[in-house]
Amino acid sequence: PFVRDEMTSPTPVSSTATEQTATQTTEDEADIVGAVGKTKEAVVSVTNLQSSFQGTDQETGAGSGVIYKKDGNKAYVVTNYHVVEGASRLSVTLSDGTALEAKVLGEDPTYDLAVLSIDSSKVTQVAKLGDSDTLRAGETVLAIGNPLGIFANSVTRGVISAQERTVPVDTNKDGQQDFNTEVIQTDAAINLGNSGGALINTAGQLIGINSMKIAEASVEGVGFAIPINEALPIMRDLEQNGEVVRPQLGIQIRDVQEFPSGYREDRLKLPDDVTKGIVVVGLTRNSGAEKAGMKANDVIVEINGKAIASFADLKSVLYRDAKVGETVKVTFYRGGEKQTADVKLSAQSPTVQ
């Protein structure tokens, strides 16, 4: 017998639901467009010009920057240190194409930040600062910059992948990772030339300075930005003082693991379970460490209760949690015995910690 196929009728789609979805999408897009509009003109291109053998200035690199302050006839731009490093002259190009000479007010290789000043007469927008401490994983963010040095004010969209990621970096280019940088991780595309550009939230607030990207073929969607709450105190120091004055113990050090096992056992006399720390190899005369009674071959394992496993840990604890003039409790081993010393911190010199 002939059997008739039973066709299932399609479920009616509510026109109201469709309208709501379309409205929601439009509202989301409006938020994004509005956020970009609040910041886009505050993002600039930064061109690094260096003297050639012929005596002329040649462009050696380009990056991005963000105008974060306007005061009288000056406007202030934050960018990455590596964008301006070695420049004999800097040019800042505004969003409308106006090129201005820029002056470096201060540089900080440790955090990869620099502050520039430019003439403010053509500046039409200043970035509004947000609060990077309130970021949540999954939150929508936008990166604005100058990718490849030729596509000014490009916008990419992504999310916060992680709000407190620690990335080891080599600040003095000696091949050793000597500082742990706390960064925002995002999957918003951050390409060559985006360095120094803005990472903003959907309110159009600056929440990070785009900095590093893991440049490996096998890694996609991994970009980093310096949280604005980390960057702001440094920006202020660079703007006002031209440098960041950081605290030091007054010691020269090496990581425990740089020493052969025989030296660790015979000279340092470390317990078997102590495999990480930093070894004092010298002290600055009249430094806080010397006055506190510390000596060569002391092995530091904690400062104010925070573990010190490496040079990078020491710098992170001192730079983030301490100030010049404060006293910190240093826990160390001497001759196999665990001891503590209260060390008053002084202003850092280039070769001492």
PLM segments and residue spans:
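C-terminal recognition in membrane/secretory proteostasis and scaffolding
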Residues: 1-10, 103, 136, 201, ...
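N-terminal activation segment of mature serine protease catalytic domains
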Residues: 2-56, 64, 89, 236, ...
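A conserved glycine-rich beta-strand in the N-terminal activation segment of trypsin-fold
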Residues: 26-34, 50-76, 98-101, 125-128, ...
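Terminal peptide-recognition signature
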Residues: 41-47, 65, 75-79, 102, ...
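Active-site loop architecture of trypsin-fold serine endopeptidases
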Residues: 50-59, 87-90, 124, 144-157, ...
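Short, conserved beta-turn/loop elements at beta-strand boundaries and strand-helix junctions
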Residues: 51, 70-72, 107-111, 162-169, ...
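Gly/Ser-rich catalytic serine loop of serine hydrolases
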Residues: 61-64, 126-131, 183-198, 280-291
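Conserved active-site neighborhood of the chymotrypsin/trypsin-like protease fold
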Residues: 67-150, 308-311, 317, 325-329, ...
